[in-house]
């Protein structure tokens, strides 16, 4: 919960300005601007952040203020805001907490001698990029726009798709130092009221200094999971059409300022696996894509542990599948081969992420080919193991959720170790543990991963 300043604007102009000058580091911070001018023969002081304000808009507003005479000057701030400010977004603020928050978030606030309130003009122009297509959630047939780091742009992208008065977007904030804006979006006639109240209550009670990692910080603060539970509690998307579709299904979408993605809940593992592209094709094609992605995702968990189990018990393998047996000499136990390859694949992935864009693709290809070819020839790995690990590495990208991919990877590693140590019993126990992770893994809505009920 954010501790707010309870002091309010008084009738003394000098005391108000003195408090602002003491609170804001005007003398030390070059980007905090303090501008004095006369309006209708009375003193006024403007406060704003350099770089956030539209200079052209402020120039026109100040020019209009200079033409105000003493006879035309209204007696109170409320009347002044209605009659003398030629701008759209204007507020009258009486609490210093609201005033300071508005100044530090980029709006222009000014005091006029004789008024017991401050006037706020939202002339902000945040540095922002275009609403280009996300690099991760690419579309085959749908819209090509994506969320950006400015929260008001993101709400506009969803409002453009849902022109319904039942679409509510409530603004709140979290973080004592960061005061990060958070938008809770929902359809008032479709949302689960109990879930909505739970979410808003948790956000209001947050006691954090900042949301330095944006939505991930908010997710961890809203739902503190056990350290050994790798499964994500929220679905993230950078596509406005996906977020809008989830709103129409009765779900809650949370937007965080400075984050180019949306949090969606409640969610299940099938929600994590599905993509927006499934709905841009005919029903049969979309169903095929969903089923294929689900089966391949399941295969990434059980494929290599099952192969290891059969290699430890070759008598169980039917004759028709005898070609999958390892034919070359095994210099390194299969379990160590699998574990080393898991680590090597992560190494290649991290190297590709930290390599300059123009070099990442060729270097990844060269490294993969060279390491794969020479590691087999040198006897470190068997070619069959390399083939099956290559399938698992590629298949892991068939589902769009990065965090879910690592959760499934940890389940696969657990199965590999248990199978190598305890053979069939270890594999069975590992399968039971994976199922328990899914069944007993509760989300913020109180449902488990296998509960696909919407509302």
Regions found by a protein language model. Give the residues of each.
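Short polybasic/polar patches that bind polyanions
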Residues: 163, 204, 349, 376, ...
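Membrane-embedded alpha-helical signal segments
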Residues: 1-306, 310, 314-316, 323, ...
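Hydrophobic alpha-helical transmembrane segments of membrane transport and translocation systems
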Residues: 383-455
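Transmembrane alpha-helical segments that form the functional core of multipass membrane systems
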Residues: 253-254, 261, 267-400, 404-413
């Amino acid at each position: 919960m954010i501790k707010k300043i309870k002091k309010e604007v008084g009738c003394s102009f000098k005391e108000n300005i003195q408090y602002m000058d003491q609170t804001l580091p005007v003398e030390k911070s070059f980007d905090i601007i303090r501008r004095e001018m006369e309006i209708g023969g009375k003193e006024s002081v403007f406060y704003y952040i350099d770089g956030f304000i539209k200079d052209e808009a402020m120039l026109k507003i100040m020019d209009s203020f200079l033409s105000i005479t003493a006879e035309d000057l209204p007696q109170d701030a409320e009347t002044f805001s209605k009659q003398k400010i030629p701008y759209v977004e204007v507020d009258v603020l009486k609490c210093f907490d609201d005033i300071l928050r508005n100044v530090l978030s980029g709006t222009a606030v000014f005091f006029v001698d004789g008024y017991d309130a401050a006037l706020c003009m939202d002339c902000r122009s945040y540095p922002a990029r275009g609403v280009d297509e996300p690099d991760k959630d690419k579309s085959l047939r749908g819209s090509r726009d994506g969320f950006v780091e400015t929260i008001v742009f993101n709400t506009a992208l969803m409002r453009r798709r849902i022109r319904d008065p039942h679409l509510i977007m409530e603004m709140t904030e979290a973080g004592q130092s960061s005061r990060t804006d958070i938008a809770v979006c929902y359809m008032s006639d479709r949302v689960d009221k109990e879930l909505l109240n739970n979410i808003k209550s948790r956000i209001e009670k947050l006691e954090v200094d900042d949301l330095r990692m944006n939505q991930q910080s908010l997710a961890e603060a809203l739902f503190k999971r056990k350290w050994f539970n790798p499964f994500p509690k929220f679905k993230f998307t950078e596509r406005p059409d996906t977020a809008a579709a989830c709103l129409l299904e009765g779900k809650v979408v949370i937007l965080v300022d400075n984050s180019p993605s949306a949090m969606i809940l409640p969610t299940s593992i099938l929600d994590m696996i599905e993509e927006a592209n499934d709905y841009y094709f005919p029903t049969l094609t979309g169903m095929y894509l969903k089923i294929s992605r689900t089966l391949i995702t399941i295969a990434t968990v059980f494929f290599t542990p099952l192969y290891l189990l059969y290699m430890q018990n070759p008598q169980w393998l039917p004759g028709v599948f005898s070609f999958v047996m390892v034919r070359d000499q095994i210099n390194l136990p299969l379990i160590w081969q699998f574990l080393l390859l898991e680590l090597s694949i992560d190494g290649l992935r991290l190297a590709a992420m930290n390599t300059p864009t123009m070099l990442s693709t060729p270097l990844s290809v060269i490294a993969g080919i060279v390491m794969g070819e020479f590691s087999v020839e040198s006897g470190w790995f068997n070619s069959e193991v390399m083939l099956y690990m290559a399938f698992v590495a590629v298949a892991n990208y068939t589902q769009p959720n990065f965090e879910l991919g690592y959760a499934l990877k940890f389940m696969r590693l657990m199965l590999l170790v248990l199978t190598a140590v305890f053979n069939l019993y270890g594999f069975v126990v590992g399968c039971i543990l994976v199922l328990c992770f899914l069944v007993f893994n509760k989300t913020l809505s109180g449902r488990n991963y296998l509960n696909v009920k919407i509302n």
